[in-house]
Structure formats: C-alpha cells, structure tokens
Amino acid sequence: MKKRTIIFLTITTLICVIFGILIIVHNTHTDRRYQSENISNEYFHSDDAVVATVNDNNITNREVSLVKYSYHTKDALDKAIEQKAIVQLANTDGYKLSKTDLEKERDYINNTYEKLNLPDNEKNQMFKEDLIKNHLEMVTSIKYQNQIKMLILHQEFCCDDELINKEYEEYKTLYNEWEAGGKESSKLYKQIWNLREKIAQEYIQKRIEQLQIKKY
C-alpha cells in the first residue's frame, strides 16, 4: 500500500512540476496586455466611472484594469466583483493580513512599480497606491479562502447551510477513515482534497450570494 502511495505522490509531483513549467512558458509568451507596462497605460486611459457595487462599495474602471493585470483574465469585471466580495467576507470575519504579509506584499509592488521607471509625480503616485491597494485585496482574498480550507482540514469549520454541513460531515467521515488507515490510501486522500475544495468554494459562494451586488 505504501509503495502505491509513493508512486501516486511521485506522479502527482511530476505533473505539478510539468504544469508549473507550462505556466512559466505561457507567462513568458503571454499577451502583452497583461504586462505591467501596458496595464499602467490602460489604467491611465481608464476613468473612475463606477461599473459595479458590492454592498455599496464601488468598483471603478481603473480598479477593473488592475484586476485584469493581477489575474491575467479577460473577465476582469466579474473577478473584481468576486475579489471585492471575498474581502468583505474576510472583514466581516475579522480576518486581516499579518504585519509580515503586509510588508512583504507592499515591497513586492514597490519593486514592480520601480521597474516601470515612471516619473515621480502625483498621477503616478496615485497609480502606485492603487496598485498596492488592489494587490493587498487580492492577497487577502486568496489567504482568506485558504483559511477556510484550513478550518475544514482541522475540522473546526462551522456553517448554517444544511447541504454544506452534510458535505462537511461526509468530509469528516472520509478523513477519519483515511487517518485510521494510516493515511496510506491515495484514493481516499484525493477524495478528501476534492471535497474540501468543493465545500470551501460552495461556502464562500453561498455567502457572496447574500451580498448586494450590482453591475452598471
């Protein structure tokens, strides 16, 4: 059984490495509209017109242009709405980035901005601050979602949705079964992983649906 688990993990690792290489190659040859130089141009050619709201928190064209850069997506408006919504859920739950994370992410954007070699003026400083704001929202969104997954993993998750709770009970049963078997079943591990991802996604989506979201 251990041999099969080792083989499965080895194959999975190889697939991840290959997939990672493909992503790097893709990003190296990616559409130029997703490069920071071009996003800065798009940002400056965008306006502050409100294109959507999430619980009365506005999303402007300029914010959408930054989200397009952050996620390399054509569906930037929908992604901007999702990001804004998840950040609001994080705020409601009292989730915040650590001081270390804040400093690290700010340094990352400052370094990215410096590479653009833009003149030091008020307009460019506003662009820089918006870059930082959007990036911190993106990181908050990602880390908050990971926190939900960790709560499920450690069986500390709670929810008032009947269907999600049913899936959560199934998850706990599978996890305990996997643990009782010495954590050797790769098949059970895959089921547990997929179910955890599914529960976290459904839980967040259910809460997003309760927010007031409008597109203009």
Q: Each PLM stretch: what is its role?
A:
Residues R32-M138:
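N-terminal targeting/tethering segments
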Residues N61-E82, K128-Y203:
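Well-structured core secondary-structure elements of compact alpha/beta domains
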Residues M1-K74, W178-Y216:
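Short, low-structural-confidence N-terminal segments
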Residues L118, H154-E162, E209, I213:
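Charged, solvent-exposed alpha-helical segments that act as regulatory interaction surfaces
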